[in-house]
Amino acid sequence: MMIKKYFNPSGSITIFLSISLSIIISLIFYTLESCHIDSLVARSEGITYLSLDSLFGQYCLPLFEDYGLFCLNEQGMNLENEIKKYADYNCRTPASILHNTSSFLNLTVKDVNIKKVSYITDNDASEFVKQVCDYVKYMEINSFANTLRDSSNSERPEVFTTNKEGTLELDFDSIDITKANALKKYDSNYNNPSSEDSTDTNNSDSDSGKIPSDLKDNASAYIEHIIKNGLLSFLVDNPENVSSLTTDKSVLPSVTCQLTEEGMAANLGYTKDPTKTTIEKAYFCEYIYNTFGCYLEPEKDSSLNYSMEYIIHGSDEDDTNFINCCSHIINLRLACNLAYLFSDKDKYNDAKKVAKASNILPIPGAEYLTRITILTIWAAAEALLDTRDLLSNKKVPLIKNNDTWTLELSDLTTFSKATISKNNGKNGFTYKRYLELLLATENNISLYYRTLDVIQMNICNKYNDEFRISKCVYSIQADISYLLPYLFTRKKITYKSTGSHRYR
C-alpha cells in the first residue's frame, strides 16, 4: 500500500520531464546552430572582401610604376571567374587545406554576380584626376625628402675652403674657374663642330627649299607647308630633325570614350567649374610636367615623341603639335613683351616719335594706331627671338628688362635669323615651363583625355600592343552567394554577401 502511495502509475512526471528536456536540448541546438550560422555569415563577408582585394592584386604593374595609377586591366580576364577562384580558395579552412578534410566552417561558393564595374575613364575621367592629384602630393613629399637626403649626404664641393677658425667659407675664385671650365667646354663644341654636323647642315639647307609633290595640287596645304617650314627654319637650326611621327587616334580614349552631359558642356565651353581651375589643375599640370617629354626631352618608345605638345594641341602629328605650341608661346611672349614696352618710357617714346613722323594724313587716332602697330611688331620680333632661345634650351623671363631685351626699334629693319639674342638664358622659365603655362589654359576635359591618350600609346609601345586604358578597372562591386553547411537541420542555407573594392 505504501508503494502505491509514493509512485503515481499515470506517468505524468515522466512526460513532463521529457518535454522539458526536449525543449532545453532544442534551445541548445538552436543556439549552437545560430552561432554556427552567424560565424559562417561573418566569415563569408570577410571572404567576399578578401576575394575582391585579391582580384586587385593583379593590378596593371606598368601603369602603376610608370604613371602612379592603380587599376586592374580587365582585358583577357573573366572577372566573375577570377573572383570565384579566389573565393573558393578562401572558403577552405586551414585544417582542410593541410589535411584535405571537411569542416563545419567550410563554405561553398554558389555563384558570383558582378553588380557594377567602374573604369578609370568613366565620369569624365574624374577618378583618373583624383589618382593623379594624390600621386603628385606624395611625389612632392618624396622629392622634398630626397632633396634633404642628398643635401645632407653629399660631399662638400671644392668651392668651399676652411679658414683659420675652422669654419667653411666660399672660395669665389674657384667658383669662377669652375664656370669658366664648363663654358670653355661648350665653347669648343660650338666653335669646332664635327664634320658630320656640318654635312647635315649643308644637306638641310639644300633640302629646305624642296616642295613635296603631294602639296603642289593643294593650295591650302601648300600655304600651310610654307608657313610651317618658314617658322621652323627660323626657330630651330635643323628643321628636318623635328619629329614627323604620326599616330592612329581611332583607338585612343579621347575618341572612344563617352562624356557625360556635364562633361560635354564643359568640353564645349558652355560651363566652367572654377574649383577645377585652381589646386586640382595645378596638380594635374605639374603631373604632366614631371611625367611626360617634349621637344627638348623627347619620349622614347612612343607613337609620338612630343607628348606635352600633343596634350596641348591634340593633333596626330608631332610636327603639327610642335608648331602649334611654338605659335602659342610666341603669342604669350608677344603679350608679355608688349606689356614691357608700354612700361619702358624710352622705348615707348621711340615708337611714339616714329608713329608721329610717319603720320601723313590728319586722321584722328591714326597716330595712336600707328604707334600700337609699331609696338606690336616690335614685341612680336622680340617674341620670335625669345621662342628661339627657349628651343635652344635657354631660360626666358616672363617679363623682360633692359638687360635681357635684345632689339632696338632701329634693329627691325635688319631683323633676320642671324640676329643674336642678348638674353644670357640663366634666369626665367624654360621651354617646358612655358608648355606648363599653356597647359593651364587648356580645357580640362581635353587635358584629361589627351593625357590618357599618351599613357595608352606609351604602354602599347613598351609592353602590350592591345592595351586599352578604357578597360582599366578602379572599382568593382559584386554579390557572392554561399551555401552554408548545416549542423542540426537538413535544410540548405544560402547567404548572399555584397562586397566592393575601389582605389582609396
Residue ranges and their predicted role:
Residues 2-81:
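Alpha-helical assembly-interface signal, strongest on the long, hydrophobic N-terminal helix that forms
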